[in-house]
Amino acid sequence: MSFTGKLAELLARPNQDPAGGPEAPWYLKYGSRVLGIVAAFFAILFGLWNVLSIIGLSVSCMLVAGIIQMLAGFVVMALEAPFCFVCIEKVNDVSKMVDAKPMFFRAGLYCAMAVPPIFMCFGLASLFGSGLIFATGAVYGMMALGKKASAADMRAAAAQTSYGGNAASTTSDRAGIVSNAQPFSFTGAVGTDSNV
């Protein structure tokens, strides 16, 4: 396969529906990819910043958290934009394998990769870099939940009771959840009040 054919195949993937995935609007499909690419770029950049700012600071905090954040950025970049790693053949295979899995797998993977650098070294660089990866996971999680019902379906479901009948709608100020509850007196003390 030629280089241009391979590049066209890699760029056409976001338009295809994932295997077994829910119907997602086009702006969520492309938006999640773009957010993932931007998140990976900033995670790599701020992870490198954490690693290079090791001089005079905590080794375990900056060095380890920065390396984990950079690795998370590279994984997200490899899964969201495998055309950035054209020279590595296995990246495309791994990306196709992850694309075949349900959306909640990718959402959980991204959220799980984003949390350790934030807990290991809480700072703006780790919060922003890993926070964007976590936001990408949250968008994939929303896509995994699927499309909500139409407004008419939600109104019909809200009007029904748990027994399947129609709920008696009331607009009284004294309507309550419990049918035999005594209302508070609006003019004075309740008759059973001990005035203590």
UniProtKB/Swiss-Prot annotation:
The gene is flower. Belongs to the calcium channel flower family. It comes from the Eukaryota. It is found in: Cell membrane; Cytoplasmic vesicle, Secretory vesicle, Synaptic vesicle membrane; Presynaptic cell membrane; Endosome. The lineage of its organism: Eukaryota, Metazoa, Ecdysozoa, Arthropoda, Hexapoda. One of its GO terms (biological process) is synaptic vesicle endocytosis. Transmembrane protein which mediates synaptic endocytosis, fitness-based cell culling, neuronal culling, morphogen gradient scaling, and calcium transport. Regulates synaptic endocytosis and hence couples exo- with endocytosis. Controls two major modes of synaptic vesicle (SV) endocytosis in the synaptic boutons of neuromuscular junctions (NMJs); Ca(2+) channel-independent Clathrin-mediated endocytosis (CME) in response to mild stimulation, and Ca(2+) channel-dependent activity-dependent bulk endocytosis (ADBE) in response to strong stimulation. One of its GO terms (molecular function) is calcium channel activity. Keywords: Calcium, Calcium channel, Calcium transport, Cell membrane, Cell projection, Cytoplasmic vesicle, Endocytosis, Endosome, Ion channel, Ion transport, Membrane, Synapse, Transmembrane, Transmembrane helix, Transport. Homomultimer. Associates with the dally/ magu complex. Channel activity is inhibited by La(3+), which reduces Ca(2+) influx and thus inhibits it's function in promoting activity-dependent bulk endocytosis (ADBE) in response to high stimuli. It comes from Drosophila mojavensis (Fruit fly). This is Calcium channel flower. It is a multi-pass membrane protein. The record marks E80 as: Calcium ion selectivity. GO terms for cellular component: cell projection; endosome; presynaptic membrane; synaptic vesicle membrane. InterPro entries: TVP18/Ca-channel_flower (IPR019365). The keyword Isomerase does not apply. The chain crosses the membrane at residues 35-55, 59-79, 114-134.
